């Protein structure tokens, strides 16, 4: 039973250069690198507490190229939640997410119960925008997933992205504690049932 597994696996997909690694590194390590280094596949871990026991948030930063279809399928089949990243400065990068989403549907079946975030990164580069947020929001509604714009460079909406992703989890109660503060809504929920909190 995957719910009893002691890790929670999040896979990050998107075209090369959209900022997948930058988002993950900003979240896990609080760092940002200006130079682009293509990723084959990296996995990052953070210890979280889940329903009063320890588990691991495991984030797989996948390759942006299409050279490794078997690795992509494996990341989807093992994943509990998915982040689909495009750059707001590249319409092509949004188009490249469509076959990935279709593959998630094919492998996972009913995706309505699976946390998926559509993420428009590089919102700090608004003058070069090719994808309007309204267009991405419409696609997210079609895909029945959540949508957010982020900037790994400015650290805008990065923690919030992971918080929102965990909030979408329906089979388990998982939550990200941001800066040690909990909202009143979180506190109310915690009184009702167990919670996952990043340490």
Swiss-Prot record:
Which SUPFAM superfamilies does this chain map to? P-loop containing nucleoside triphosphate hydrolases
Question: Quick one: where's the S-geranylgeranyl cysteine lipidation?
Answer: 196
- Which EC class is the enzyme in? hydrolase
Q: Keywords of this protein's UniProt record, alphabetized?
A: Cell membrane, GTP-binding, Hydrolase, Lipoprotein, Membrane, Methylation, Nucleotide-binding, Phosphoprotein, Prenylation, Ubl conjugation
Example GO biological process: signal transduction
Q: How does it sit in the membrane?
A: Lipid-anchor
- List every position bearing Cysteine methyl ester: 196
Task: Reproduce the UniProt comment on modification after translation.
Answer: Ubiquitinated by the ECS(ASB11) complex via 'Lys-11'-linked ubiquitin chains, leading to its degradation by the proteasome.
PROSITE patterns in alphabetical order: RAS
Q: Which Gene Ontology CC terms are recorded?
A: plasma membrane
EC number(s) recorded for this UniProt protein: 3.6.5.-
Positions of post-translational Phosphoserine modification: 35, 126
Proregion residues are: 197-199
Reaction catalysis annotation: GTP + H2O = GDP + phosphate + H(+)
| Gene Ontology MF term list | GTP binding; GTPase activity
Which InterPro entries does the UniProt record give? Answer: P-loop_NTPase (IPR027417), Small_GTP-bd (IPR005225), Small_GTPase (IPR001806), Small_GTPase_Ras-type (IPR020849)
- Location(s) in or outside the cell: Cell membrane
> At which positions is motif Effector region?
36-44
According to its UniProt entry, what is the function of this protein? Displays low GTPase activity and exists predominantly in the GTP-bound form.
Q: Which NCBIfam families match?
A: small_GTP (TIGR00231)
Q: Which family does it belong to?
A: Belongs to the small GTPase superfamily. Di-Ras family.
Query: What is this protein called in UniProt?
Result: GTP-binding protein Di-Ras2
Gene of origin? DIRAS2
